[in-house]
């Protein structure tokens, strides 16, 4: 793998850090447990660390890679014939069209580029109905945010939306020295499985997303100030929410209650949440 890296200059703008530890690669492939006939999608195959061993198991693998140089690099390997290649940004790929073509739930995995990992997660959450599971290598800090509880430093909008949509498990942490070039931060391998039915009820997830975004834009402000234009102190108290609390102190259930109150009482009825 180190020899491969020397042949390809990693691009900072694409957050290219390649996993080189073969034991970890085997561990990841074993956990993903790819099967024949599944719709498997790899985000950013890179130098083929996961691509090759997975292609040894399956007959077809869909890969999305924005760097044409990397795709040209992979062409020299025999497993390339098993790949269905899309040279484009994973954020704008048409996953819904893929689902309709294959008529199967999609399994997505990969070492997500650091600079767009959060954006990609939100993108996939919105498509939860067509996804079977997701297995990603993420920045450790992002992984901690995914599973964070109210009242903790890591808890935020990502925690709320992620837990609304998915059951999330931290599988293992990966030290930075297992990548080339060596990043400044450690990583974590995470498994996300969309809920068949969310444990949290909201009339409209877009409203929940809106108010959590509003609340956490200035997370140190108390709710009376961050959400005061929507909820009066009287309404907060009616919903058993202390207006003196900060955004990080409210549970997912409480945010759902706030979003449902907006819908049920036609608050912000002229607001476009798209």
Curated annotation (Swiss-Prot):
One of its GO terms (molecular function) is 16S rRNA (adenine(1518)-N(6)/adenine(1519)-N(6))-dimethyltransferase activity. S-adenosyl-L-methionine binds at residues 17, 19, 44, 65, 89, 111. It is an enzyme of class 2 (transferase). The keyword S-adenosyl-L-methionine applies. Keywords: Cytoplasm, Methyltransferase, RNA-binding, rRNA processing, S-adenosyl-L-methionine, Transferase. It catalyses: adenosine(1518)/adenosine(1519) in 16S rRNA + 4 S-adenosyl-L-methionine = N(6)-dimethyladenosine(1518)/N(6)-dimethyladenosine(1519) in 16S rRNA + 4 S-adenosyl-L-homocysteine + 4 H(+). InterPro entries: KsgA/Erm (IPR001737), rRNA_Ade_diMease-like_C (IPR023165), rRNA_Ade_Mease_Trfase_CS (IPR020596), rRNA_Ade_methylase_Trfase_N (IPR020598), rRNA_adenine_dimethylase (IPR011530), SAM-dependent_MTases_sf (IPR029063). It comes from the Bacteria. GO terms for cellular component: cytosol. Its EC number is 2.1.1.182. Coiled coil: none annotated. It is found in: Cytoplasm. SMART domains: rADc. Pfam families: RrnaAD. Belongs to the class I-like SAM-binding methyltransferase superfamily. rRNA adenine N(6)-methyltransferase family. RsmA subfamily. NCBIfam families: ksgA. Specifically dimethylates two adjacent adenosines (A1518 and A1519) in the loop of a conserved hairpin near the 3'-end of 16S rRNA in the 30S particle. May play a critical role in biogenesis of 30S subunits. This is Ribosomal RNA small subunit methyltransferase A.
């Amino acid at each position: 793998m180190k020899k491969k890296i020397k042949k390809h200059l990693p691009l900072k703008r694409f957050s290219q850090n390649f996993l080189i530890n073969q034991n970890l690669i085997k561990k990841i492939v074993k956990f993903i447990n790819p099967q024949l006939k599944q719709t498997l999608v790899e985000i950013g195959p890179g130098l083929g660390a996961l691509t090759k061993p997975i292609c040894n198991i399956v007959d077809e693998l869909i890969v999305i890679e924005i760097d044409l140089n990397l795709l040209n690099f992979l062409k020299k390997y025999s497993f390339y014939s098993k790949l269905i290649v899309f040279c484009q940004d994973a954020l704008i790929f048409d996953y819904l069209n893929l689902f309709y073509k294959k008529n199967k739930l999609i399994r997505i995995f990969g070492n997500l580029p650091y600079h767009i990992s959060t954006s990609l997660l939100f993108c996939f959450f919105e498509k939860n109905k067509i996804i079977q599971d997701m297995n990603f290598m993420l920045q450790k800090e992002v992984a901690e945010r995914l599973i964070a509880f109210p009242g903790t430093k890591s808890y935020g909008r990502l925690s709320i939306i992620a837990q609304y949509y998915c059951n999330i498990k931290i599988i293992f942490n990966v030290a930075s020295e297992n990548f080339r070039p060596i990043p400044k931060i450690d990583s974590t391998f995470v498994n996300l499985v969309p809920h068949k039915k969310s444990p949290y009820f909201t009339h409209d997830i877009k409203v929940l997303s809106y108010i959590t975004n509003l609340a956490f834009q200035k997370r140190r402000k108390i709710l009376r100030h961050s959400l005061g234009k929507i909820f009066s102190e009287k309404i907060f108290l009616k919903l058993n929410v202390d207006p003196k609390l900060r955004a990080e102190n409210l549970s997912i259930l409480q945010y759902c209650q706030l979003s449902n109150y907006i819908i049920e009482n036609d608050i912000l009825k002229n607001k476009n949440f798209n």
